[in-house]
Each structure stands twice: as C-alpha cells, then as structure tokens.
C-alpha cells in the first residue's frame, strides 16, 4: 500500500514480473475487481483517495493500459454502465503507508472493503 506525495491518497502498489504474469493479465484483474465508472468513490467510500487510477512506472505500459481501458469500456457500455473514470498517468513520488495500513484486510479479516466489481468480464481476444 502506498500514498501519493501530492495528497493523502492511498493506493495499492502492484509489482509484477512479466515472466510470471503479463501486463494484459494484470490489467484484466484490475478492471474486473472494482467498478471503474464510479468517479471519486468505491462503494460507500467517497473522495478523491478512492478514485480508480493506474500509475505507471514506465511509458512502455501506457499504450497497453489505454487500450485495455478502451476494450473494457466497450464491454461496460454493452452492459449498461457509463464511462470509465480511471486516470492513467505516470507515477510520481510515493511513500509507504503507515504499518497499520499495510496488509490491512489480512490483519483485520472482518474489516470493510468497498471494492466490488461490475460483474462484467474483460473480453478475451
């Protein structure tokens, strides 16, 4: 879990090994595990810190990320959802969150998590 330096926003940092999992597979999981059409919220959690965002650490991932957004947008529209509000931009400075926020749901199995997908599967091409 990380926080941005520009504000007190909290994000999930996902490090991946493309030899184990492709960026395409990671993006599929990303789109399916939350509702990217909710703007500044996820479930009952409201505010900019709950917005859907992809921070990239390499320009090499930008085109594939944008393409996946367009693909999933088409699927969402077919199922009655509005536009995706996910921001895709380069990662700037970040700082690790406080220890009590690290692995929060593992430490608090009954803790609240406002994430919920749309039920729309990412199309297989």
Q: Where are each of the predicted segments found?
A:
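Flexible coil/turn and secondary-structure edge motifs
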Residues: 5-125
